[in-house]
């Protein structure tokens, strides 16, 4: 039986209306057990200022972003179930959901799925990597009961 441990940190000025811990747990459990038996992830929900600062510091981009992934790297010879941290910006997620005409809950779920796959080593820099990652995201989102998160982007009206 797999075990997923979540450390949820709420660092927004207004934490009302955010998905609850059980919902974040369900999303993680929809992703991680497919890849490893045990996993521990911190999800920190932040405002634009913190997202912007972290994005500038670690990616050189002076703007807030939807999700940042910080994989944990254990010292050689030490095995821990700690995968890493996801930093998710509330305002960016809410704005993107509205702009893309997506259900807010589904977009939150997508950010957790997307970020978790980054923690597991997936990326989307090269086209073939992006295709593999998007395919996994779509499959996982369907398993969680959500539509293809890329459908609207792939098939504009």
From Swiss-Prot:
Coiled coil: none annotated. Its cofactor is Zn(2+). GO terms for biological process: rRNA processing. Its EC number is 3.1.-.-. Binds 1 zinc ion. Zn(2+) binds at residues 114, 118, 124. GO terms for cellular component: cytoplasm. Keywords: Cytoplasm, Endonuclease, Hydrolase, Metal-binding, Nuclease, Ribosome biogenesis, rRNA processing, Zinc. Signal peptide: none annotated. Gene3D superfamilies: Metalloproteases ('zincins'), catalytic domain. The keyword rRNA processing applies. InterPro entries: MetalPrtase_cat_dom_sf_prd, YbeY, YbeY_CS. GO terms for molecular function: metalloendopeptidase activity; RNA endonuclease activity; zinc ion binding. It is found in: Cytoplasm. Belongs to the endoribonuclease YbeY family. Single strand-specific metallo-endoribonuclease involved in late-stage 70S ribosome quality control and in maturation of the 3' terminus of the 16S rRNA. This is Endoribonuclease YbeY. The gene is ybeY.
